[in-house]
Design a protein with these regions (language model features):
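Short, intrinsically disordered, charge-balanced linker/junction segments flanking boundaries
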Residues: 234-237
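ATP-dependent adenylate-handling active sites, centered on carboxylate activation for C-N bond formation
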Residues: 1-166, 173, 181-232
Length: 237
């Protein structure tokens, strides 16, 4: 089994914690590779190469996207393609098992809009004035339409109902964006990436799991961690 990870030059010096990444991945990659006995390869990128790939990544996607997040993925896929034509990737575990901070922080969870885009002002400021005068209204209408379309049970508590809505918001919007990004960058690199966490049976099952079961002790992706306790993976993972 061959596994890959990506890092950046001098990341050990300049890494800063954030809501999305409270710890550097490098702290756990070695533990994981050793536990599963994989032939692990770490791809190290630098800022110059990532910046120079911005235009190519945008053209590969066909629309403006995640800028350096796209170009770094493009370079990473290109490195993997040197050895393999097909690989597995872990996209969407955060969406269906509650790994993002907006599943756990009340002030974000109950915000009456998309949790990852609570304001469109900054994004809209990048566009020519008047190009999308109703941009904020469009975003809010899409949010309300998704929430209204979410199936809930009469017995759901307010928290359980909101978690179902959050699940739909993530799978219908955030997850789709990640999948389109992964598909565009990987196929541009002649690499086929498969995403087992997106199997419809797993997604359907996860949707129907009570939040207390999905997030035991309030842990991000708690049920997924529980599934691999014991002899499967190191306790740090």
């Amino acid at each position: 089994l061959c596994t890959y990870s990506v890092d950046y030059e001098d990341n050990d010096r300049y890494f800063q914690k954030s809501l999305f990444q409270p710890n550097a991945d490098s702290d756990y990659i070695g533990l994981m590779a050793e536990a599963i006995g994989s032939d692990h390869r770490n791809v190290v990128l630098n800022n110059v190469d990532v910046a120079e790939a911005l235009v190519e990544a945008t053209l590969a996607r066909g629309v403006p996207g995640f800028t350096d997040v796209d170009s770094s993925l493009l370079l990473f896929c290109r490195q993997v393609h040197r050895d393999f034509k097909v690989c597995l990737s872990g996209e969407c575990a955060d969406e269906i098992f509650g790994g993002y901070p907006w599943y756990h922080r009340q002030e974000i969870l109950f915000a009456d809009t998309f949790p990852w885009s609570r304001s469109v002002d900054v994004r809209q400021s990048l566009l020519r004035p008047g190009l999308l005068p109703e941009g904020a209204d469009y975003v809010q209408a899409a949010y309300r339409r998704t929430v209204a379309d979410t199936e809930v049970l009469d017995t759901d508590s307010p928290l359980e109902k909101r978690m179902r809505q959050m699940f739909r918001l993530n799978t219908d919007w955030f997850m789709q964006t990640l999948l389109m990004r992964k598909d565009a960058m990987s196929m541009h690199s002649a690499l086929e990436v498969r995403v087992p966490f997106c199997d419809w049976r797993l997604v359907e099952y996860a949707y129907n799991m009570p939040w207390a079961l999905k997030s035991p002790e309030g842990r991000e992706k708690g049920v997924l961690r529980k599934a691999f306790e014991g002899d499967w993976l190191p306790p740090e993972i």
